[in-house]
Amino acid sequence: MKRYEKFVLEAEKGIAFKVSEGTSGELIIRALNIAIANVYSTNYVNPPIPEGYKHFCGEWNNGFVIERCSDGSQFVWIPVGSLDSNGTLDGEHFSQKFGKRKYRNCEFDDYYDALNGELLEQLESVKKYGGFYISRYNISKSSEGKPQSVRGVMPWVEIHFEDAKEVSSTIEDNEAVKSHLTFGAEYDSVLEWFIKTEVKTLAEIAEDSTEWGNHWNTKNSPRKLVETGSRGKWCTNNIYDFAGNVCEWTQEQTGSTRRVLRGGFFRANGDEHPVASQECIHHFDCADCVGFRATLYIK
């Protein structure tokens, strides 16, 4: 039989391929129609608690927080199954509960999440359990140099995309749970949850996030980078600092070398860089106002 160095799979828009290895060493390629496969578990009201974690506070609909017993890192449940089906994964079909939203038309069309194995695995997990966990705080560095999601520590900044992605993947990697740098689909699902639960309005998401994050023009603004969880007003559904303090790396991209930062930061006004804002920079750029979060994938 002739051997090929590579092969190409082609499909209509809305079809994605998931590649895995079978039990006998064979290669399995599954075609997934993400445009119509929109069935989510209704069990989002009972968030799963992975081994090694405990429930810390909150309910499923206002910020169910789990804490890792080993280091106190905390994550918040996002009940995707409770959201409206107005998101997209392919940029064309707005029929997903889990996906990006077009909050700001001027930015949306240029940026996308690559439909790779990691995102497709997360999609299947979200449908299975009805949601996902995101870090309650921006990721910081412990005294041992390990990533953590805890209160009262300076966010991990001056980090470029590749390192943020690598660091995020080391937070959890076992048979039950894996971690990764947040995708745009996950980021926007959090924003949609804020709107759905009526703790924030669309205008506060897309136009002006001044008063619920650390911005230059926030009332009594420190006008500098501050520790995670510094103010209660900057907490929404038990997630801290989502609107400001640092903007956050995501796995959104435009082209092969440019990645997308989400949200506002302490040097910018909240009406210029609201939480839904997107800014594209080179993946090896870094700054003292750029941080990141991590998301958990439950197998």
What do these predicted regions represent?
Residues 158-172, 177-182, 233, 254-299:
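Disulfide-stabilized, aromatic/cysteine-rich ligand-recognition loop
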Residues 84-93, 141-146, 257, 269-272:
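Short, solvent-exposed loop/turn elements at domain surfaces
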Residues 1-30:
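Short, low-complexity N-terminal tether/leader segments at secretion or assembly junctions of large
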Residues 81-83, 138-141, 251-256, 298-299:
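Acidic glycine-/aspartate-rich tracts in secreted/extracellular proteins
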Residues 243-252:
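Active-site-proximal beta-strands of protease catalytic cores
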Residues 23-88, 179:
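GGW-centered surface loops in extracellular recognition modules
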Residues 60, 71-72, 91, 96-241:
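Short aromatic-cysteine micro-motif
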